[in-house]
């Protein structure tokens, strides 16, 4: 009998894919991670990025099981757990210093850096753009084989594939015809670095954690981050998926885009001077840091609430590939890390069950029912959180969003 070393692939090197690779490595299980992007440089990973608050039962549990708890703790501190809620007139309606349960904030880049540095470099294949994923039965062995076709690399065959390739997942096409759908909102992202020294008044406005100014179905939200930064999200509610084209924002810098946002009566023309100053400064600073670059403004997508697929042997999805949702429940990365945690346990359990001497077909027979249960559990909790997130989106991006968000926090 051949010695078992199941051929496991993880498609996607985001938080869920990297965490799954690290969790399997901790258990002595080999998996290859294929990632579209080139390996990020230290300079790129040091840049300000969105902040992620990790929850005890999911993100924090994954950090502990990855053996990264101390390193994770050392990477915190850029953003506090404090919250400020303002209305468009600039009136503060709610402040707090975080809930009873700690939910520490880490930047997306810091989390990525932590996972990359603790995963053996030979397990991650960078610059691998996937063309297609196929499934077929090997008539000789009886095992299901998953074939991955790349644009510029040799085709590879695996016994099990976890699709962690995000919103526009190629892997998902093998399992589900459902494409992401437009959520009804557009997002502009801009960053102010060294805010405390360069713009102390804006630093005070935003506080040390998260600030949300909401109303008239739009929002300005900020998070503090690396390099004493303020990361601004200008969120515009519109049924027009092609809004950036409709209003002529394509191929414009953030400094140019700000005029549309600040001059429109339906957007931010009548907001408080301090909030308009925040938006203008963030757009100007973004263009100063990235001269000539197009503004980062785009539609926000989600998978249909309750998205699921018929189970197939040898392949599954995790993270945004499985359950892309809007960010209004703060659960996206936490669910992704929870998926990685549970799937790693399932793969390890199948490994223990069949022992060292088994072929791929026997391993898949042991694994398959466990993956079915994993998928049912994952999709059930994801559906609940996706529904919550979509409900919050409609609540917070309403005419009186600030009042409704303040009430939400006061009742938590």
Q: Positions of the model-derived regions?
A:
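A structural signal for isolated positions on well-ordered beta-strands in alpha/beta enzyme cores
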Residues: 9, 32, 231-233
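Conserved mid-domain beta->alpha element of the FAD-binding
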Residues: 9-30, 37, 162-163, 188, ...
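Eukaryotic N-terminal low-complexity, Ser/Thr- and Lys/Arg-rich leader segments
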Residues: 1-8, 19-28, 121, 138-150, ...
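Short, solvent-exposed loop/turn segments at secondary-structure boundaries
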Residues: 46-47, 175-176, 246, 329-332
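Conserved FAD/dinucleotide-binding core of flavoprotein oxidoreductases
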Residues: 94-97, 102, 107, 112, ...
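Conserved N-terminal helical subregion
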Residues: 2-8, 23-25, 49-195, 243
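A short beta-to-alpha transition loop/helix N-cap that caps and shapes the active-site region
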Residues: 40-44
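Histidine-centered metal-chelating micro-motifs
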Residues: 168-169, 189, 218-221, 322-323
């Amino acid at each position: 009998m051949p010695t078992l070393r199941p051929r496991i692939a993880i498609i996607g090197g985001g938080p869920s894919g990297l965490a799954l690779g690290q969790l399997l490595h901790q258990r002595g299980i080999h998996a290859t991670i294929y990632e579209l992007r080139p390996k990020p440089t230290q300079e790129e990973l040091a840049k300000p990025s969105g902040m992620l608050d990790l929850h005890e039962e999911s993100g924090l549990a994954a950090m502990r099981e990855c053996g990264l708890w101390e390193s994770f703790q050392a990477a915190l501190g850029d953003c506090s757990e404090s919250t400020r809620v303002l209305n468009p007139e600039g009136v503060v309606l709610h402040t707090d210093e975080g809930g009873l349960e700690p939910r520490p904030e880490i930047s997306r880049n810091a989390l990525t850096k932590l996972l990359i540095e603790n995963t053996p470099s030979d397990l991650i294949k960078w610059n691998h753009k996937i063309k297609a994923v196929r499934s077929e039965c090997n008539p000789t062995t009886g095992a299901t084989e998953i074939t991955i076709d790349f644009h510029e690399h040799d085709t590879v065959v695996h016994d099990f594939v976890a699709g962690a390739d995000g919103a526009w997942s190629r892997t998902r096409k093998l399992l589900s015809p459902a494409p992401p759908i437009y959520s009804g909102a557009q997002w502009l992202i801009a960053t102010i670095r060294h805010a405390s020294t360069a713009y102390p008044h804006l630093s005070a406005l935003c506080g040390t954690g998260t600030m949300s100014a909401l109303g008239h179905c739009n929002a300005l939200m900020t998070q503090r981050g690396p390099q004493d930064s303020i990361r601004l999200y200008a969120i515009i509610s519109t049924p027009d998926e092609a809004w950036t084209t409709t209003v002529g924002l394509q191929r414009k810098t953030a400094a140019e885009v700000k005029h549309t946002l600040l001059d429109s009566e339906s957007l931010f023309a009548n907001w408080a001077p301090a909030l308009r100053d925040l938006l203008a400064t963030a757009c100007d600073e973004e263009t100063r840091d990235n001269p000539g670059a197009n503004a980062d403004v785009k539609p926000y997508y989600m998978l249909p609430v309750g998205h699921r697929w018929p189970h197939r042997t040898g392949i599954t999805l995790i993270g945004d590939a499985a359950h892309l949702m809007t960010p209004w429940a703060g659960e996206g990365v936490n669910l992704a890390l929870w998926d990685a945690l549970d799937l790693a346990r399932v793969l390890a359990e199948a490994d223990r069950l069949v022992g060292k001497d088994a072929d791929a077909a026997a391993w898949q027979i042991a694994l398959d029912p466990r993956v079915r249960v994993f998928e049912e559990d994952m999709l059930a909790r994801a559906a609940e959180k996706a529904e919550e997130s979509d409900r919050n989106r409609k609540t917070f991006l309403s005419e009186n969003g600030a009042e409704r968000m303040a009430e939400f926090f006061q009742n938590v």
